[in-house]
């Protein structure tokens, strides 16, 4: 192949690259992913396979027959038309979803708590109309518990003032509120017939946010062992907003997916969703090579199903309101073929 290939950047824009340029991006992506996460680089054979995927001139790409994986969704059904139940039905019957999620538009358990009775009734109605497993999902969203929206002093304001101990204490106090709200919502949804719970974008506010999710999962599984629980991450790396928080002896700050999945399964999660954010100025090939490199070590230690996040802006999927299908299909195939993941 001597000409140029039409491919995508991380923002979804169409660009033309040569085979040599795509190969160089693949090698650069795995190199920086390995260097940052201290993981092995992808093998030559894996890079060759990715090159085949991204240099193909086909409009779509797909896994081989027999290699299909489960498609789970966080936030399926967003009132584009009709009711949320209508949207869930559309995801099940028209989009091929294997697992569905009911959610509130605020997507925060702090907000859901105030409308739990309404959400529980919607869950019950949805369960009567659907066949696919249906979970309820939202974010731990630890930041909402800080002032002015919450009762806790704002640690983001305290830290620049060098009031570090106060900032850490504030995060610990916020964790207690967040855990209570997540457990409360889970109890209501379980009674309404939910098949599971999703704690999505965990770690968005740092290690305290991640600890809140893990603690809530442990409490819920202790009460309801049959409840499915998905833990989806906010990023490939847990930020140390507190810096000293631990879960069962493991420091959370600085964790990459291989360590994240260990604490997730120890807490009782039944599915783990690693997230690797995209660089919008780099090619999709570069982003996919980096994502595969960062997630691959987690596959070797995971004892629960792993579903890499492939929403807009994560996992290699372009950051665009409507990610182009040619890019999404290549990203999906690459993650399944290289990682041998359980789903997406």
Regions found by a protein language model. Give the residues of each.
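Alpha/beta enzyme core
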Residues: 2-304, 320-344
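Active-site pocket-lining segment
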Residues: 306-320
């Amino acid at each position: 192949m001597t000409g140029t290939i039409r491919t995508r950047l991380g923002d979804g824009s169409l660009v033309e690259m040569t085979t040599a340029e795509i190969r160089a991006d693949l090698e650069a992506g795995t190199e920086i992913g390995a260097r940052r996460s201290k993981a092995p680089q992808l093998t030559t054979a894996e890079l060759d396979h990715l090159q085949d995927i991204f240099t193909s001139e086909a409009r779509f790409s797909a896994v081989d027959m027999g290699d299909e994986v489960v498609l789970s969704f966080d936030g399926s059904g967003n009132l584009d038309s009709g009711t949320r139940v209508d949207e869930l039905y559309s995801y099940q019957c028209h989009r091929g979803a294997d697992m569905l999620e009911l959610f509130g538009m605020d997507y925060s358990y702090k907000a859901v708590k105030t409308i739990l009775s309404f959400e529980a009734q919607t869950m019950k109605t949805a369960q009567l109309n659907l066949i696919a497993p249906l979970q309820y999902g939202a974010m731990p969203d630890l930041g909402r518990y800080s002032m002015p929206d919450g009762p806790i002093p704002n640690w983001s304001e305290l830290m620049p003032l060098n009031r570090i101990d106060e900032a850490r204490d504030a995060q610990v106090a916020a964790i207690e509120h967040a855990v209570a709200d997540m457990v409360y919502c889970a109890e209501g949804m379980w009674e309404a017939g939910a098949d599971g719970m999703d704690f999505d974008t965990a770690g968005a506010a740092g290690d305290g946010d991640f600890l809140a999710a893990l603690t809530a999962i442990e409490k819920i599984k202790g009460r309801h062992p049959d409840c499915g629980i998905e833990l989806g991450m906010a990023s490939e790396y847990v930020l140390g907003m507190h810096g000293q928080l631990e879960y069962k002896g493991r420091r959370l700050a600085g964790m990459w997916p291989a360590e994240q999945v260990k604490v997730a399964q120890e807490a009782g999660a039944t599915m783990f969703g690693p997230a690797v954010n995209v660089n919008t100025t780099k090619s999709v090939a570069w982003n996919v090579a980096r994502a595969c490199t960062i997630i691959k070590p987690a596959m070797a230690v995971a004892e629960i199903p792993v579903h890499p996040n492939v929403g807009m802006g994560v996992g290699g999927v372009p950051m665009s309101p409507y990610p182009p299908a040619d890019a999404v299909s290549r990203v999906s195939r690459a993650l399944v073929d290289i990682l041998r993941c359980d789903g997406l």
